[in-house]
From Swiss-Prot:
One of its GO terms (biological process) is translation. Part of the 50S ribosomal subunit. Forms a cluster with proteins L14 and L19. One of its GO terms (cellular component) is cytosolic large ribosomal subunit. Belongs to the universal ribosomal protein uL3 family. This is Large ribosomal subunit protein uL3. Gene3D superfamilies: 3.30.160.810, Translation factors. It comes from the Bacteria. InterPro entries: Ribosomal_uL3 (IPR000597), Ribosomal_uL3_bac/org-type (IPR019927), Ribosomal_uL3_CS (IPR019926), Transl_B-barrel_sf (IPR009000). It comes from Chlorobium luteolum (strain DSM 273 / BCRC 81028 / 2530) (Pelodictyon luteolum). Residues 128-168 are annotated as: Disordered. NCBIfam families: L3_bact. One of its GO terms (molecular function) is rRNA binding.
Amino acid sequence: MGAILGKKIGMTRLYNDKREAVPCTIIQAGPCFVTQVKNAEKDGYDAVQIGIGERKEHKVTKPMLGHYKKAGVTPGYMMAEFDASMFDVELAAGSPVSVESFKEGEIVNVLGVSKGKGFAGVVKRHNFGGGSRTHGQSDRLRAPGSVGGSSDPSRTFKGTRMGGRMGSDNVTVRNLQVVKIMAESNLIMVKGSVPGPKNSYVKIVSIKK
């Protein structure tokens, strides 16, 4: 069991014992440190807060800088909370968290923010088929079509699929296999793709059994 933060480096391929190419995502999981430990008596629930990376102090707000100094760690780029039951050992503020809490072959979930696509129409965003390409029409190729009748229902229903901002959603990719762990470099490689562009931050959590 384990949980950690990481930065998506990119994708590569590894070859298994059967000489099969396995697509892998490389994640820089560390250096990570515990920034706060919450308990039920004081905070109402048990959790461990983790930060990743090292950031210059002048780029961090004063309240956050005080939070990091209280834990005795350098300011990081991201913080996230995980359930205390995700960790096999008892952690304290300032404790390091490494990829060694995972094992090769283990199954994990990876959480992140998907790539932002900007404003997209209904064909790209919702896979609409678009209008007819023939019979004289000239401007209905990628139009959404009707979104509500005039007299009945005289309105557009909530949730009607239309154009809008696409991407930048919280996404969880489940059941990814840990292919390789390089503890000396804080690298973890998982089979398949994970959300977000390169250099985006993700959460890696073990699957609770």
